[in-house]
Amino acid sequence: MDGAQFAKMLSDKHLFELNRMEYKYSTVSVKEFAELLRQNFAQPLPLTDFSGNKLFYLPNLAQISTNGMKQLLSVPVSGQNFGLSAMTEEIYATFQIESIRSTRSRIRYILDGYAPRDEQEARIYGMKRGLEFIANRQNRITEENLHHLYQISTGDYLPDEDRLLPNHFYRHGEVFVVGGEEPRPGLPAERLPGAMKCLVDFANANDGINELHKAAILHFAFAYYHPYFDGNGRTARLFHLWYLVQQGYPAALFTPFSRYIAENKDAYYKAYERVERNALISGYTDVTPFLFYFCNEVYNRLQVDAVPPKTDLEVYQTALAEGKITEKERLLWEYVLSAYGAEEFTTKQLEKDFRNAAYATIRTFVMKFHEMGLLTARKAGNRVFYHVGGTSDGRPL
């Protein structure tokens, strides 16, 4: 294949849909093109497909925006394990992806520390336990901890027929993957221990792979192997976040990743399908279509809801260092960042949600932080709504 033809195919908008490329360029040309990519551009991974052959990816064809990188590298100022506002959205979106009915108010009820009242809230409580587990960087990625994460977030809430056997980390029988156009079987149960050990070893390897790419590869491979009877997608998304936390991306738990997936979950499932369909044409499994999807539809759209502008942080940190902020005000500020993010709130709502401050203290806090330019106030009738971020003049209402 000459260079001009190769370059034309490489820049084709249907690059990751080899079946469409065949119609345009011919089966022979696409086969040759795919082989040239594998030989000269693809990077092998220490993971295998269902045939026992290595997975590949093309690192230069899945670009991550500088803004997306900065968002995930930013350090939340909240003292909470995760952003309550962001993780409310994360859990809500996860249930949307799985077609499970829930409400944000119920999710927030559980995240605020209340006990579950029914089966729906028990599932939410499981997600909360999972988020708390991965937020602790002392909980390293091991097979034992992965099993524990699965059990506390999902496994403990499944019917008996979908539960793992005692002393088993993975399923003991066949499972079918749904979500795409056609169900397909997961990796045979007898091969799961070896495949999952390789996956965990890969997560812990210092191999120079871009961490955001690697997190998405772990996400893909986990769901691809489907090690459980149920809860695989949910655990894959938690695994993704867990890896980012372990790699020093604290804002990962202040970012509702799954919201972006839920907004177009068909594209999420199609990205999986493209990997598998392309393998039938190319003869090898290239995970780049999933990386390309994740970079474009998630990473490059990131908004870390709980992190205010740097100038606001400097104002706060200076005031704190000068002793102008009380301990109660510090706790209230951290709670506002975590619980509301960019959302509006009222003094009455903050009093109810925080549950550990008198209304007079709440009122003094919001007026003071508004005057400092850390909170914006908006009047609507007799009510005043606040949100993180300063006004131009900092004057109280």
Regions found by a protein language model. Name each.
Residues 1-229, 233-397:
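FIC/Doc superfamily catalytic core
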